[in-house]
Amino acid sequence: MSIGTIFRVIKMLYSVLWYTASLVSFMFNAFWLCCTLASAGIPWATLLLVIVCIASKFFKLSSPNEKQLNSLLGGNVADDLSFWPIAHRGGAYDAPENSAAAIKKCTKRGFRNVLLDAGITACNEIVIVHKSTLQKAGLCGSISRVTMETLQNINISELHPLGSQFEPEKILTLGNLLRLLEGTNLTIFLLISDSSSKMIEKLKSTIKLHESFTRRVIVCSKSPVAIYQLRKVYPELICGLWCDKSPSRIILKTSTLLTSIYGAIFRNIIAPVIGISLVFISKDEFNLHISELWRNVGVRPIVYNVNSPNEKRYFQKVMKTQYLTDSLRSEPQLLVKT
């Protein structure tokens, strides 16, 4: 090996070592800068958190009492098998979703808890329908862009796999629903998909006109602001917060610390301020620890969507938690005739 070759090898090794040392130095300096900024920001973050906690005490709404909640949910008796399931959209696998037929079927089977979707039309009418129903009917866009006249032309029975077993069904208005509840012991979980000011004002006027609304309906929303606006006017109204899966939640999962902080803010600040009684959590994000954390702040968790008999038995016997289900035929302890 010639002297020139040896010199080039030594020069190459020197370059590699120099670049490696430079990279390590850069990473160390960047880490040191992050630590410095974090240490400087911690006092300010702590101060901000204290201010938010103090301010929340002045805006906090009182929660409805547990007795009122139990009367709506049918108590909290583990031996009462009808207590655990909440029929999602009236049991969308068993009957046309969000329909009068689905509600009547739940009543006939002895189940009293039903979750229905609600939106508001372009003509300012609250309707019991989900946007997926409109898509099946060939209508594009949100419910707020469709008129009531257009919706009345839809036969939702035709859109269901078992539609031939049912009479033609029209989309219900909220007024139709409240009249349908008369003479029944049903409790309706009304999941509002639209948290616009138009929807909130229409709901307020509906509650004002129907004294039984707060005794028969639990309003659920993904928006804490919408819940706060409703409960500020009607503090006796029982509300539930729907925790949806979103890209931001997926990002938070990458950091255990961020996830813990995010959950703590919702449980210890937002939930007490808006005075919710229920929270809806995906079964994939639920465990005994999460359940205890929510119950400790006076909020009852409900999981969604549970359709397997084995899963239902697990949530009944182990988790002691109510669940949304798309089918009442799969209740593990009951043989339900269709």
Where are these regions (language model features)?
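Phosphate-group recognition and catalysis centered on beta-loop-alpha active-site segments
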Residues: 2-338
